[in-house]
Amino acid sequence: MRSLLLWIAVVVCLLCSVAAVVQSGSSDGFGKPRDTETAISFLEYKLMAPSVPMIPLTLIHGADSKGAVCLDGTLPGYHLDRGFGSGANSWLIQLEGGGWCNNHRSCVYRKTSRRGSSKFMEKALAFTGILSNRSEENPDFFNWNRIKLRYCDGASFSGDSQDESSQLFYRGQRIWQVAMEEFLSLGMKQANQALLSGCSAGGLASILHCDEFRELLPSSTKVKCLSDAGMFLDSVDVSGGHSLRNMFQGVVTVQNLQKDLSSTCTNHLDPTSCFFPQNLVSDIKTPMFLLNTAYDSWQIQESLAPPTADPGGIWKACKSDHSRCNSSQIQFFQEFRNQMLFAVNSFSNSDQNGLYINSCFAHCQTERQDTWFAQDSPQLNGKRVAESVGDWYFDRAKNVKAIDCPYPCDTTCHNLIFE
């Protein structure tokens, strides 16, 4: 098993987004922010080959006239690498992840980072994994039009309100709409194939917007959706509380998301429950592929054992490196895996849907070359992630659904270790 070392001390210096501001040794809402998303993003950057082409940032000019702006009022942006050959009329839209802001302070903080302002976004990004333009790295989508839509609203491209006093613009839904208008004008309206994808908070966004994406395109266009590490569960944390539910409740309340959530869900559940994908995926009409690790690193760090639920630090070593967990802690993770499998059970009954749940301690596998398609990539039933997604999208195989055996049986994992 290959383990990947991720140096949190270095990452803190590069901190530029907040999943939810959590304090160390502070109870009043102030202190050093922790950010697992940035830590994982830093690891992905370190894994990229130096020869990877850089794709420039394009701002959506005129978006501000429609109120489609980042948290700080700046223009939203994207990176586009044009398709070629047989893929010239095929489109892949990758929605960026990066946590959420769940209160006034964390949303204000994001205004000073790329997660809330295009002023701080990288001027160019490396396209790897599912975004790569090389057939040997991305066999099925390498020659498609590949777009990465940047994330700067803090609510998974949802919400349409603002905080006048702090000049905070919660305009994720408008950003989604103007971005889609832009892509349609660039040629996506003539697409013969399209895939809406996303990682983490972007994976949740792919779930939230999947059917909406389908409706944008002609019925003759083949449209499917992929959610990578987007199955955030409404789980009990190590203290018996509901850390992620509390966070999501803040997101829904602060950004006034109620009106943007699925009415099919809100007709029988509260708005916060309808931000959890486990209550949404079975009602999606468009074919959807769920890719997730059974022991999602972000959820372990921020939902199951955040510092607020573990003030004594009993879980600190275990959540940083699973090899340092005791048997009861591993059992807690096994119960989380069982919840994951239960959450996708109804979804998996549909023949049109795809599933890939591997028993790894990781987060986001589509944009990392080592986990998407490499010689030693993780495998399930002899298939790497890219191969399974391709089999499902192009209907090369029936019933593309793979669920791994429980930890520690999978020796192909690329596990994340935080030190």
Curated annotation (Swiss-Prot):
Glycosylation sites: 133, 326
Spans traversing the lipid bilayer: none
Record bears the keyword Electron transport: no
First-tier enzyme category under EC: hydrolase
Alphabetical keyword list: Cell wall, Cell wall biogenesis/degradation, Glycoprotein, Hydrolase, Secreted, Signal
Active-site residues annotated for this sequence: 200, 296, 363
EC number(s) per entry: 3.1.1.-
Location(s), subcellular: Secreted, Cell wall
Domain of life: Eukaryota
Disruption phenotype: No visible phenotype under normal growth conditions.
Chief location bin: secreted
Lipid metabolism among keywords: no
A Pfam family the protein falls into: PAE
Signal sequence coordinates: 1-20
Cysteine pairs bridged by disulfides in the record: none
Entry similarity comment: Belongs to the pectinacetylesterase family.
Described function: Hydrolyzes acetyl esters in homogalacturonan regions of pectin. In type I primary cell wall, galacturonic acid residues of pectin can be acetylated at the O-2 and O-3 positions. Decreasing the degree of acetylation of pectin gels in vitro alters their physical properties.
Listed name of the protein: Pectin acetylesterase 6
